[in-house]
Amino acid sequence: MRWPNSWRKNSEVMEFAVELLPVLRELIAGEQSFSCDGALCAELERFHLGPLAYFRSGGKLPAPWRRQFCGQFRQQAGNALRQQFAFDQLAAMLEENRIRFTPIKGVDLAFRVYPVPGLRPFCDWDIWIHPDDCARIRDVLKRDGWSCELEAIADHHFAMRRKNGFCLEPHFTLPNFNGIPVRELWKECIPIQEGACRHALSPELNLLLLYRHNNIDFFRKSNLPKLLADLGFLLKSSRINWEKLARLCWSFRCGSPELLFQAFPEFFLKAAKPEEKHSAEAARALRSILLAPPQFETYELIMNARHRFSWEWWKTRLRCLRPDNVRLKYLKQNQSGNFALFYCHDFLKKLYNSVLFSAQSSSAELAEFQNKLEKIEYFSSAVPNHSRQK
């Protein structure tokens, strides 16, 4: 199952996404057997929701679509079983070496939140390592046969590791939580049993992670069906302490996911949520952005930001010039003779893009998008950090 990307650039499909929201809510709720005609099946296929429709319908779908969705579901279920077996081996190895870790994102949601793992496809395994164990994790993985193309550190994770066709991404902090003390975040990780090294995110931090991860890079990587499905199953499987969530948002100085509930009331119709306190104007701005993620170039957004050339803006831009960022971007080892050449190339490319987009006048569409970001920032402090890897 692949989550859709093409819908972002097509106004007709975008309009359908709004009509699909009650259907997606019904599929997640699973309170009654799901049934649909061929036309709706075709639309579900466009959004790669066929396996979920097959699972909820008990196979009661029009014959051609039943066979197609059944094949997709079985393929995903088989792949999930293979992934689960291999991941359990990794988890056992980490337990033996007393490496404290927490599965996050897809590998956590598939096996712990969704009704069956086959409904939540994912590519790599994201695990978050306890800060006191980060110094040992790379050597432990190397001894176990996990290899990487180059050893470099990104904004929130170590280099990708591979073994037997599987990909592992060890994190030293959560994505888009930069500036928040890691030990404070780790307090929201719960051991799966007494004395275990394997932990699980608290429902409140998991909810916050899904929301903030979706906001990376000016919402350019947003995937609304995927986000809503993840949130829907999380709310269905977990009891959210809304007061605790509010305390976490205040402590971490980050926007609350509650704004998303107000932005999509037809989807979160029955979700237990606190009284809506956010601006309806900010919610409309968030809804508009998520229904049609921006198609602007990253540097076009960076060089037209209202706060450009501020101290925070400069710190973010300088972090992009870290040698490890260039190594990850061009897959060049530190000892490579061409590294200096690639570093100069990357610097000149950034300089060219900065001058190019600074000289261009802002379009009406870009100005409108910037206004939407400002509304979200003002009412919820939820404007994402700039991309660190451009």
Q: Residue ranges of each PLM-predicted region?
A:
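Conserved NTP-donor binding/palm subdomain of two-metal-ion nucleotidyltransferases/polymerases, i.e.
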Residues: R2-C123, I129-K390
